[in-house]
Amino acid sequence: IMSSDWSSDVCSSDLAFSHDMPDYARLYPVPLEWSRKYAIRRYGFHGISYEYVAGETSRLVGRPLEDLKIIAAHLGNGSSITALDRGRVVDTSMGFTPLEGLMMGTRSGNFDPAVFPYIMEKTGLDVPGILNVLNTGSGLLGVSGVSRDMRDIVAEMDRGNARAKLAFDMFVHVLRKYLGAYLFTLGGADAIVFTGGIGEKAWRVRQAVFSTLEPLGLVLDPEKNQAAAGAAACISAETSSAKLLVIAADEERMIARSAYRLAAG
């Protein structure tokens, strides 16, 4: 990177958006000395995407961000979900590393660490070897045995592949668990947003997520859901208690906006 008297360098961190998450959400229930001495905490990722999505949600619903409770899910090969209250991150699924949280393309998501010594004994793998499997050979790929790509998973599921269906069902199940937890954390939501490759394009996933949530007031419009395309779309029915949105991630635009704000002073 080159600098001169007429240029400046701007660093845009993917972690910055969740920097003021409350301690009760960002810290792990381990000895507090670990957290303080070794910075063991939930850092949160996809922050640039979430900052952009939050602003677009405010614009689409016609209300200031400071007046909104938003649950946003960035679903792709790396997936996470975040709860925002008045523009502030109050909880997020990725943690100390991007391995924690939702089931992903090749990452396991949440995993009981007590399995480590058991797998080490059974397979002969060391810790780096196990972490490699959890990061690159698990998730949709590991369960389905087919692919990390949700499009391939759905196609195989429709052909009757039981492992592909299991992978799809697990992905949706974990996502729904987090969605329910964040609805309780926020005390409800004004908008639920899907972004990222799977979030934007996999209408079957969105359909499965909301398939039984009408009693909670979250009502999907099936036609809008299947037709959703472009930069942004509302896929909720008129009777839904929250706006259900699909917003295309535009992290480059968010980085450019941040750089412009800094340059403008």
Could you tell me what each predicted segment is?
Residues 8-9, 187-197:
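Short glycine-rich phosphate-binding loop at a beta-alpha junction
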